[in-house]
């Protein structure tokens, strides 16, 4: 490793605040929420299994998601030096190889905690950790692709935690997730491709310089925003259709109302795709994840 790979800093140990910033608490919500959606959709009493639920939520958010952020920031330190030089690693607040050490330590911690959730929890954790490194690290680095990268993150952030939350609770009843749970989790995970694309709007300049083919970098902000909106909209349209087919008209209508709200937010976002991407994250995405919980309640205990 060359000297250029190390953060220029006179510090020998990381700043405590910088370590918290490195694992980005703001990113923990989606997998925590998805795990809770899975627990709800299982129709297994949550209060009676609150220990498993809380442990799974902590694993999905602060531990696995936090680990993925640390790994991504370490592997992205050259990009961040261009786009966001104030971040912990390029700024030197986390010096030397400390970013890598933190990511590795949290990977091991993830597996230890995942083991406490049984075979379902451990295998899911193993997949989540593998996905995090596959997304960021060379030579795999799936984030170089604007299609594979967001798709992998969507599955890891939404689909995998949802199915895991349901599977861990259902294991207490000696059963496993059925088709409705797997299908709805998968649809929302596929739709999350659009949500993950939104996050790429803040790094267009650096992505282009370093050859990362995110959708905004390759197609431009306007086309990328249209792709993201289409993906999110189609996934939810399929969810709504299936809920009607499952004879859950009230839940389907509620998700439809939220989708209409997203269409309004999308129209606002499209006026300035690059500038309003953070705004859409705080409006349209909130409606998207609200629909996830409505869907979870709709399919709890439902079999086909």
Swiss-Prot record:
Bilayer topology annotation: Multi-pass membrane protein
- State its role: Catalyzes the esterification of bacteriochlorophyllide a by geranylgeraniol-PPi.
GO MF annotation terms: transferase activity, transferring alkyl or aryl (other than methyl) groups
Which terms are listed as keywords in the entry? Bacteriochlorophyll biosynthesis, Cell membrane, Chlorophyll biosynthesis, Membrane, Photosynthesis, Transmembrane, Transmembrane helix
Q: Does the keyword Membrane apply?
A: yes
> Which InterPro entries does its entry note?
Chl_synth, Prenyltransferase_related, UbiA_prenyltransferase, UbiA_sf
Protein name stated in the entry: Bacteriochlorophyll synthase 33 kDa chain
Protein encoded by which gene: bchG
Which GO BP terms sit in this record?
Answer: light-independent bacteriochlorophyll biosynthetic process; photosynthesis
Q: Per its UniProt record, what NCBIfam families does this chain match?
A: chlor_syn_BchG, PRK07566.1
Against Pfam families, the record matches this protein to:
UbiA
Ranges annotated as spanning the membrane: 26-46, 51-71, 94-114, 117-137, 151-171, 178-198, 227-247, 250-270, 279-299
* Pathway info: Porphyrin-containing compound metabolism; bacteriochlorophyll biosynthesis (light-independent)
Superkingdom in the source lineage: Bacteria
Subcellular location per the Swiss-Prot or TrEMBL entry: Cell membrane
Organism of derivation: Rhodobacter capsulatus (strain ATCC BAA-309 / NBRC 16581 / SB1003)
GO CC, any one term: plasma membrane
């Amino acid at each position: 490793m060359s000297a250029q790979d190390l953060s220029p800093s006179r510090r020998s140990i990381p700043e405590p605040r910088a370590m918290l910033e490195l694992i980005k608490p703001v990113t923990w919500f989606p997998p925590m929420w998805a795990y809770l959606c899975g627990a709800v959709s299982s129709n297994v009493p949550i209060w009676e299994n609150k220990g498993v639920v809380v442990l799974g939520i902590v694993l999905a958010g602060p531990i696995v998601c936090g680990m993925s952020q640390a790994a991504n920031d370490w592997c992205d330190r050259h990009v961040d030096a261009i786009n966001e030089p104030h971040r912990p690693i390029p700024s030197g607040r986390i010096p030397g190889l400390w970013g890598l050490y933190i990511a590795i330590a949290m990977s091991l911690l993830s597996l230890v905690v995942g083991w406490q959730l049984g075979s379902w929890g451990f295998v899911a954790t193993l997949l989540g950790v593998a996905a995090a490194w596959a997304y960021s690290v060379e030579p795999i680095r799936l984030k170089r692709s604007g299609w594979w990268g967001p798709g992998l993150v969507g599955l890891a952030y939404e689909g995998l935690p949802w199915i895991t939350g349901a599977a861990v609770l259902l294991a207490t009843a000696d059963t496993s997730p059925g088709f409705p749970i797997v299908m709805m989790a998968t649809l929302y995970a596929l739709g999350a491709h659009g949500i993950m694309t939104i996050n790429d709007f803040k790094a267009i300049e650096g992505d282009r310089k370093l050859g990362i083919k995110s959708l905004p970098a390759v197609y431009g902000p306007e086309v990328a925003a249209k792709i993201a909106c289409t993906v999110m909209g189609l996934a939810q349209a399929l969810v709504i259709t299936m809920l009607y087919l499952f004879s859950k008209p009230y839940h389907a209508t509620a998700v439809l109302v939220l989708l209409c709200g997203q269409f309004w937010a999308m129209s606002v976002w499209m006026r300035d795709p690059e500038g309003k991407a953070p705004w859409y994250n705080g409006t349209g995405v909130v409606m998207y994840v609200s629909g996830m919980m409505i869907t979870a309640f709709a399919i709890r205990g439902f079999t086909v």
